């Protein structure tokens, strides 16, 4: 089996409050729908708490894939960690996604050549195709350096219209070990979930909206209820909604 590690480092308050790695959990949950991936790759762990970079690198067991979810509060740390992982494991497929990755910066990958692929916007489809070894030139939503060292941008992402096809990482048990770890360490891990994706507006301060994400798709209400029930059962103190525009649908 090929080993996979996924990171989504939280903002930290007093060193005790963290968040579940919801975005990377969705990536892995969706990839598990593919039998080839299930039989080829093994998720070793999620990293959600920052540590000394050398400590994280030394904890890795021959990683085949190392994925990082980038936000404004962790991008610099992510880049240093990515560089260290690539130095220690040059054959590891190193992926970077999230709103911290610029969409149209032709110098980004030239400045950080240790990143193999940047995944833009929705990541579930592109992540799955990369694990399957699909020709990257045919995968929407990617940027990477071609053989001449130039940045190649794929076509815009194809969105997942039936978003309930993405299994809930909470409900399929991906975060059960984190709940156990949090209790052992005496830390608080807070929940993140979505009731919908997309937004019809184009606010300049927001990563949502625009042409690609103007259509809003709803998660089934029962799924959202079941996730909240899971969090209540596991004594999660705070739940954050990752919707671009919560409450846009009056009937929900």
Predicted segments, located by residue:
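A general structural motif
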Residues: 1-2, 61-63, 91, 139, ...
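N-terminal [4Fe-4S]-dependent radical SAM core
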Residues: 4, 12, 136, 145-192
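Short beta-strand segments
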Residues: 5-8, 45-47, 67-72, 96-97, ...
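Glycine- and acidic-residue-enriched helix-capping/strand-helix junction motifs
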Residues: 13-24
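Radical SAM [4Fe-4S] cluster-binding motif and immediate context
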Residues: 23, 170-252
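Generic structural signal for well-ordered alpha-helices
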Residues: 28, 79-82, 191, 228
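Tryptophan-centric aromatic hotspots in well-structured domains and transmembrane helices
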Residues: 30, 73, 108, 128, ...
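Glycine-rich beta-alpha loop elements in corrinoid/cobalamin-binding modules
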Residues: 30-33, 39-160
């Amino acid at each position: 089996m090929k080993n996979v590690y996924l990171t989504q480092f939280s903002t930290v308050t007093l060193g005790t409050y963290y968040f579940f790695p919801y975005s990377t959990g969705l990536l892995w949950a969706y990839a598990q729908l593919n039998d080839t991936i299930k039989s080829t790759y093994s998720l070793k762990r999620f990293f959600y708490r920052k540590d000394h970079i050398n400590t994280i690198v030394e904890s890795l067991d021959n990683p085949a894939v190392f994925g990082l979810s980038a936000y404004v509060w962790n991008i610099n740390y992510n880049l240093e960690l990515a560089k260290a992982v690539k130095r220690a494991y040059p054959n590891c497929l190193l992926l970077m996604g999230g709103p911290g990755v610029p969409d149209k910066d032709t110098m980004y990958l030239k400045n950080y050549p240790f990143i193999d692929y940047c995944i833009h916007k929705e990541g579930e489809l592109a992540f799955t195709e990369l694990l399957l070894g699909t020709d990257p030139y045919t995968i929407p939503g990617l940027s990477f350096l071609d053989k001449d060292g130039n940045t190649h941008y794929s076509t815009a992402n194809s969105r997942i219209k039936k978003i309930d096809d993405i299994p809930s990482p909470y409900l399929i048990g991906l975060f059960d070990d984190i709940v156990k770890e949090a209790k052992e360490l005496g830390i608080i891990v807070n929940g993140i979930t979505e009731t919908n994706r997309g937004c019809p507006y184009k606010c300049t301060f927001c990563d949502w909206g625009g042409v690609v994400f103007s259509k809003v798709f709803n998660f089934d209400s029962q799924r959202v209820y079941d996730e909240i029930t899971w969090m209540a059962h596991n004594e999660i103190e705070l739940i954050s909604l990752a919707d671009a525009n919560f409450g846009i649908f009056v009937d929900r």
